[in-house]
C-alpha cells in the first residue's frame, strides 16, 4: 500500500455564542500546523499500460463482488447503475488500500441522493500514536446530478482530490465535507437554486480553491469557517441570506463584500485577513459590528457603518491601514478595544453625541489623524489598556501613537470637562464649537420634506437642493435623483 503521510492536526470548530460571548479566539482555534508529505498518489497517464480502468454496472451493495481481485489494482472506475452506502465503503477501500484515483459516477444513481457521512474518510486512516494520517489516492470524482445531500466529512482530508462537480439538484453540504482538500481546484463553484446551507468548515483549508463562488437566491446560511483559508476571490451574497458564521471567509482573497439587509447574523472574524478586500457594505439593521470582522484587511478602503449600529466590536477594523474616514452614526454608544487601531489613513474622527465608551487602545496609531470632533456633552468613558499599562484609547501619555496636539472640537461649555477626564486629557488642544460636521446631529423637523431639515455633507443647512447631490435629511444620507 502506497502511503501519503502528514502530521496529524486536530482542528476544533465550536459554535460561538453571539451577543454576550465575544472573547472566543477563532484564529487560535483554527490555526493549523504545516503538513509534511512523503509520496504523492499515482497520476493517470495516457498510454501507461500499468493504468487499469474498469467499467462496472452496480445493483447496489455488490460493487466489491463485481471488482473481485481487481479491487486493489484498479486506477480508474466508471460506475453505472445503483450505488449505496456499502458501495461507498468499497470505493474508499479501493482508494485507501489500493490505488483507485478516478471515479466516474455520472451515469450512476446514488441511493436516496445522499453521499453518506465519512464516505471517503475513515478512522482507520489515523495513527494517533505516530501522529500521522494515511491519505487515500482519490484525485477526481464525477458525481451524478441526482445528488441532493453531501453529508458530514464525506471528503475530509482527501488531500489529492483536484476536481469535483456540484450536482444540479444539490441542496445541502454538511460540516467539514471537503475540509483539508487542499489540492481542490475550480475556476468557479456554482450552487443550484434550492441550495440553502453551506455548513461549518465545508471548504476549510482548501488552499488552492480560487476563482469565484456563485450562490443561489435560496441560500440562507454560510456556516462557521466555511471557506476558511480558501483563496476564493469573488462571491455574491443574495438577498435572503440570513447568517454568516464565525471566520466564514477568514484568510480568503475576496475583493469586495456587499452584504444584503437580510443578513442580520454576522460572526466574529467573518472577513478577517482578506488581504485584497477593498470594499465592504454592511447591512442596515445590525446593532453590533462583530469582533475582528475585517481585522487585518490591509487593502480595505471603504466601509459603511449602518445607522442602526450601537457598538463596534473588538479589533473590528484593526490594521486596516488604507481605510478612509468612516461615518459614525448617531446612536453609536461603544467602540471596543483596538477597533480602529492602526487605521493610519484616517484624517478625522467624528464621534456622535450618543457615544459613551471608548475601549482599550481603540484609536491608537492613527498617525494621519488631523482632528477629532466629539458631540457628546459628557466625555465618553475611556478604558485603560491592560496590555500597555496607562495607555488611553488614543495612546500613551509619554509615547503618543496618535497625535496629541491636534484640535479636538467639543460642545460649547464642555472643554473643561474633557481636559479633566482621564483619557481625554491625552490631548492638549480643545476647541469649543457648535458647528459640527454632519452625521453627529440629531436632525429633527416637523415635516420630513421641510427645507429647514436638509443639510449638505458638511453639516450646513440647505435651502436649494440640486439633482444628483447627497443631502442629510432627518439624520440620514439621501441621494436626490430628481
Language-model-detected regions and their locations in the chain:
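C-terminal tail/sorting-segment detector
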Residues: 470-482
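N-terminal segments that cap or nucleate solenoid repeat domains
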Residues: 20-91
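Bacterial Sec-dependent N-terminal signal peptides
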Residues: 1-23
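Residue-level detector of functionally pivotal "anchor" positions at catalytic/ligand-binding pockets or at interdomain
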Residues: 434-458
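Consensus positions within tandem repeat domains that build extended binding/scaffold surfaces
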Residues: 118-119, 151-154, 174-179, 199-202, ...
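A recurrent domain-boundary module in secreted/ectodomain proteins
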Residues: 43, 420-439
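Terminal processing/anchoring signals of secreted or surface-associated proteins
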Residues: 77, 418, 438-443, 459, ...
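Structural signature of tandem-repeat unit edges
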Residues: 24-28, 52-58, 75-83, 99-113, ...
